[in-house]
Amino acid sequence: MRINEKDTLLFIGDSITDAGRDRTHSASLGSGYVQEIARTLRARADAGPGPVVINKGLNGNRVYDLESRWTTDVIDHRPTVVTLKIGINDTWRRYDRGIISPVDEFEACLDRLLADTARKLSARLVVITPFLLPVTSDQNDWYEDLSPRTDAVLRAALANEAQVVRADLALLRAAEERAAAELAPDGVHPSPLGHRLIADAWLAAVDSVRP
């Protein structure tokens, strides 16, 4: 179903969604995939303003952090499309700080967020998969944690009839033709090209002519 100017799109997640947004300015979208999506949709709107786009990404967030602010930052805005991108920090904190985020607890929390939104809003739910493009040898070890976590994201999305944007697959395909660092210099945070690829994957999955 195509996005139209009556829609309110809300994006929430970690630093990949935040992308340097100005938190003192509610209209700030940052310089990442959210901005790219908004720019594309607004360019299509001709003389109209296009859909309302809200960015509630926050650096460093894990899934539990989203739960603590979900009502204020999501439900209260009454969006028609909610996009959630989370998971990489739940993995990363295990390796840089020894903070464990058990996959079953992660999945249960994510499921609660999606189910709560479905109960309270008539909104389309969209989940963007976490991803990793290793640029150091030790980052390859992260897949031990990230792979089952990605599976948990997919299960929670399926259980709550959320659309899935496979950012992980889009970026891995792109990495077959160029260095991973061109897409995510530290393996986690996308470059402008990486953000554009995520935006393109979202538009292909969500802004579709299919019913």
Residue ranges, per PLM feature:
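Conserved, well-ordered alpha-helix/loop/beta-strand core segments that scaffold catalytic motifs
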Residues: 83-85, 111, 125-128, 143
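Serine-esterase "nucleophile elbow" of acetyl-processing enzymes
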Residues: 1-59, 69-78
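Proline-aspartate-enriched helix->loop->beta-strand connector
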Residues: 75-84, 88
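Substrate-gating cap/lid alpha-helix
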Residues: 133-167
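Surface-exposed cleft-lining segments at the edges of enzyme active sites
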Residues: 56-62, 91-104, 137-142
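Alpha-helix N-cap and loop-to-helix initiation/capping positions
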Residues: 25-32, 98-105, 140-148, 186, ...
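A short helix->loop->beta-strand "cap" motif at the edges of active sites that frequently abuts
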Residues: 119-124, 162
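Histidine-centered active-site loop/cap adjacent to the catalytic His
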Residues: 161-163, 182-211
